[in-house]
Amino acid sequence: MDPKGSLSWRILLFLSLAFELSYGTGGGVMDCPVILQKLGQDTWLPLTNEHQINKSVNKSVRILVTMATSPGSKSNKKIVSFDLSKGSYPDHLEDGYHFQSKNLSLKILGNRRESEGWYLVSVEENVSVQQFCKQLKLYEQVSPPEIKVLNKTQENENGTCSLLLACTVKKGDHVTYSWSDEAGTHLLSRANRSHLLHITLSNQHQDSIYNCTASNPVSSISRTFNLSSQACKQESSSESSPWMQYTLVPLGVVIIFILVFTAIIMMKRQGKSNHCQPPVEEKSLTIYAQVQKSGPQEKKLHDALTDQDPCTTIYVAATEPAPESVQEPNPTTVYASVTLPES
């Protein structure tokens, strides 16, 4: 290592330490400008103190940046050390940072809580040394506010209504609140940054619009509240809601019971009618057949039958399967004449 370069770095470190000690004990008169940034975003810190550094190759420029968590901190963290005569790359660079040699600036990648603090910069240009500091403050961005009615009081005598509104956010650091009406008039004093607003309205001014603005040093978001949805005239209806509930709930139970009971009776009647329906019987047909005797018979038998009809009637019952179509109401009788052959 070059002895001259090593000596220069030692001198620069000594001056930087002396500056930090002087600043920490309050002996310095240097004021650190404050840089406000959003948490999680990248931030560029210029390492020049309001004048352009001559980066000629004939001149030597050395930069040392350290970071302290508090003004009186005795142990500072080394962030970057850079020697222009050795090239465009720094000798040391802490993780989470990016050094830009063209404009001599330091980029903080994705601001984190541990990135917040005092950045002390020492710049050596030939025989002159500059020392200055920058304070970085990080704030979480404010989320959209929510407005709720905490309390509502109805004055029946004079028809006025008193409301207590609350404006809150879920995210955000050092959040302050301000209230205004539709015309933009601030309803609270500048010193009062409360998230609560107490208003009293008459019947003629119940349809109003109010704005709540939640803000911090890096963000500001407003939310509009329409009072017509929370009008005081709805107080009477809200008071009558308990007895309406006590009346409507039993009535609904009775109606449901009647509907279920009616459905059960109808189902039973339908099942009974299907059960009592007579089955389809097979249709019976009766066939009458006559058998006639011919030829000589024994005399005795012939004499016994002379007074009778020479034909003998035979009854035969025939069964026919029932058709699938509509059954006929009356049976059909078929008569057939059968003649016996001569013996």
From Swiss-Prot:
Residues annotated as glycosylated: N54, N58, N103, N126, N151, N158, N192, N211, N226
Residue ranges constituting the Ig-like C2-type domain according to the UniProt record: 145-228
Residue numbers carrying Phosphotyrosine: Y288, Y315, Y335
Disulfide-bond pairs as recorded: C161-C232, C167-C212
Residue window of motif ITSM 2: 333-338
Alphabetized Gene3D superfamilies for the sequence: Immunoglobulins
Protein name: Signaling lymphocytic activation molecule
Location(s) in or outside the cell: Cell membrane
Native species: Mus musculus (Mouse)
Region (Disordered) residue spans: 320-343
Single GO BP term: natural killer cell differentiation
Entry membrane topology: Single-pass type I membrane protein
Keyword set, alphabetical order: Adaptive immunity, Cell adhesion, Cell membrane, Disulfide bond, Glycoprotein, Immunity, Immunoglobulin domain, Innate immunity, Membrane, Phagocytosis, Phosphoprotein, Receptor, Repeat, Signal, Transmembrane, Transmembrane helix
Sequence motif SH2-binding, residues: 313-318
A GO molecular function held by the record: signaling receptor activity
Signal peptide (from-to): 1-24
Taxonomic lineage from the root: Eukaryota, Metazoa, Chordata, Craniata, Vertebrata
Superkingdom field: Eukaryota
Sequence ranges on the Cytoplasmic membrane side: 266-343
Transmembrane regions: 243-265
Domain Ig-like V-type positions: 29-138
